[in-house]
Amino acid sequence: MTLGQQAESLAQGYLEQQGLTFVERNVRYPFGEIDLIMRHKHHWVFVEVKYRSANQFGGAIQALSKAQIGRIRMAASHYLQTHKLDVPCRFDVVAIEDAQIHWLVDAF
């Protein structure tokens, strides 16, 4: 298992402990990828997982570029359309740094 996969598993477990329900993982399209798809009450939650062993380069949260946010949004829109879902959604980030988990709800 790669470090990225380990981080995603850790994030998934953490979010489940917080009351979210797992739906799908690593949804890939030619134009973007979604790390985790979860449900929280009536919202579908598209989660980007960022891992850094140290924050010497600005940390995990700062590693998310505008271009990457655009690709995640496009992938989420495509997912909702292909699954015929007309539901409220949000975009969260789970940042894992130095064995600490930071959950940013509605991050972008």
UniProtKB/Swiss-Prot annotation:
Q: Give GO MF terms, alphabetically.
A: nucleic acid binding
> Which InterPro entries does its entry note?
Restrct_endonuc-II-like, tRNA_endonuc-like_dom_sf, UPF0102_YraN-like
Which Pfam families did the record assign?
Answer: UPF0102 (PF02021)
Q: Which CDD domains match?
A: PoNe_Nuclease (cd20736)
Q: Which family does it belong to?
A: Belongs to the UPF0102 family.
Question: What HAMAP family does the database record attribute to this sequence?
Answer: UPF0102
- Name of this protein: UPF0102 protein Shewmr4_3685
